[in-house]
Regions:
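Loop/turn elements at helix/coil->beta-strand transitions in domains of secreted/extracellular proteins
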Residues: 1, 20-24, 60-65
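Primarily recognizes the serine-hydrolase "nucleophile elbow" in alpha/beta-hydrolase
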Residues: 1-21, 125-126
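Short beta-strand/loop motif that positions the catalytic acidic residue
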Residues: 26-28, 32
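Residue-level signal for short, function-critical loop segments
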Residues: 7, 30, 70
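C-terminal catalytic histidine-bearing segment of alpha/beta-hydrolase fold enzymes
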Residues: 55-128
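Extracytoplasmic/secreted cell-surface and envelope-processing proteins
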Residues: 9-13, 34-36, 75-79
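Conserved alpha/beta-hydrolase "acid-adjacent" motif
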Residues: 33-49, 79
Length: 128
């Protein structure tokens, strides 16, 4: 599973899995104000973001890789596929080689594309 700035809605408290979930790659901006990076919960209802889900996976022993995209907002939902090396690494290790790892990493893109570049199919000089 590839999750870019995603979350799970639950009306029964924190998410529970009847079966072991597939290995999951989470990528989420820590400044996301659209979908919670962590969680929003009111009584038994809640929206559980990547940080909360990764913590749940860790406690339950499920395989996952969680990239916190430092300083990024919900744009990660649009730019997740701009990280082919991380995605290829995850698919190779977790899916094809069946590694059962749990990984948390912080990714701070020092050469981040300007926001307007995300709306173009590919950010190249030809598209400017």
């Amino acid at each position: 599973v590839l999750s870019f700035a995603g979350a799970i809605f639950s009306h029964e408290g924190r998410p529970r899995y009847r079966e072991t979930p597939a290995p999951t790659l989470f990528m989420h901006g820590d400044k996301d104000k659209v979908v919670p990076y962590n969680k929003i919960q009111l009584f038994s209802k809640g929206l559980f973001g990547s940080k909360s889900l990764a913590r749940r996976f860790r406690k339950a022993g499920y395989p996952y890789a969680f990239f916190t995209m430092q300083g990024q907002t919900h744009d990660v939902a649009l730019t997740g596929m701009y990280h082919p090396d991380e995605i290829t690494w995850f698919v190779r290790r977790y899916v094809f080689e069946h590694h059962r790892w749990q990984m948390n990493a912080e990714l701070d893109e020092l050469d981040r594309l300007p926001r307007e570049a995300y709306s173009k199919p590919y950010a190249t000089d030809a598209n400017k």
